[in-house]
């Protein structure tokens, strides 16, 4: 019998960092949201892999580069004590290119499932958009929506990652 692992999939903008406008790629604008480092530490201590899954369509639109995304991810890792196990991003946008990595498709999730031998039934997605919830549901991952970015009916829905962490750790 093979042992499987559990993970928290995390959308980036609006969950881990403050969302400013349509895209966040400048280091000066990349602000880690309050409570994120502590929440990640609690989840890691509970045995979860921590995996970022983020759409970065600004690359396809030529607004910024993959190098700028990597710089933001390095800043995030530094702020969070390097607790994140993987940071995946899709650089596609439907107006420019197609990709199975782009949420609501589940390609980024599937990469992590294979890499870390994850059991989707033991995993969660925390995101601020319905497409995050759809991507997780496509492979059997439970979702928690945070914030009020989209006016959609989804339960559970909480204020931020701190509140989502409390739900996950009580489950």
Predicted features along the sequence, with ranges:
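Generic enzyme active-site microenvironment
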Residues: 9-11, 53, 126
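Metal-dependent phosphoesterase signature
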Residues: 13-34, 59-68, 92-100
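Asp-based, Mg2+/Mn2+-dependent phosphohydrolase catalytic module
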Residues: 2-4, 67-85, 93-171
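Substrate-recognition element of Asp-dependent hydrolases with the DxDx(T/V) motif
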Residues: 36, 40-73, 84-93, 136
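Active-site neighborhood of HAD-like aspartate-dependent phosphohydrolases
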Residues: 1-49
């Amino acid at each position: 019998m093979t042992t499987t692992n559990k993970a928290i999939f995390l959308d980036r903008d609006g969950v881990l960092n403050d969302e400013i406008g349509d895209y966040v790629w400048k280091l000066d604008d990349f602000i880690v949201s309050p409570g994120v480092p502590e929440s990640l530490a609690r989840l890691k201590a509970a045995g979860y892999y921590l995996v970022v899954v983020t759409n970065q369509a600004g690359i396809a639109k030529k607004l910024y580069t993959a190098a700028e995304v990597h710089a933001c991810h390095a800043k995030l890792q530094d702020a969070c004590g390097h607790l994140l196990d993987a940071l995946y991003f899709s650089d596609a946008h439907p107006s420019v290119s197609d990709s199975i990595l782009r949420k609501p498709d589940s390609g980024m999730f599937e990469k992590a499932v294979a890499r870390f031998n994850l059991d989707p039934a033991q995993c969660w997605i925390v995101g601020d958009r319905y497409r995050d919830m759809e991507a997780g549901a496509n492979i059997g991952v439970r979702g928690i929506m945070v914030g009020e970015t989209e006016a959609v009916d989804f339960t559970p829905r909480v204020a931020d990652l701190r509140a989502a962490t409390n739900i996950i750790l009580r489950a």
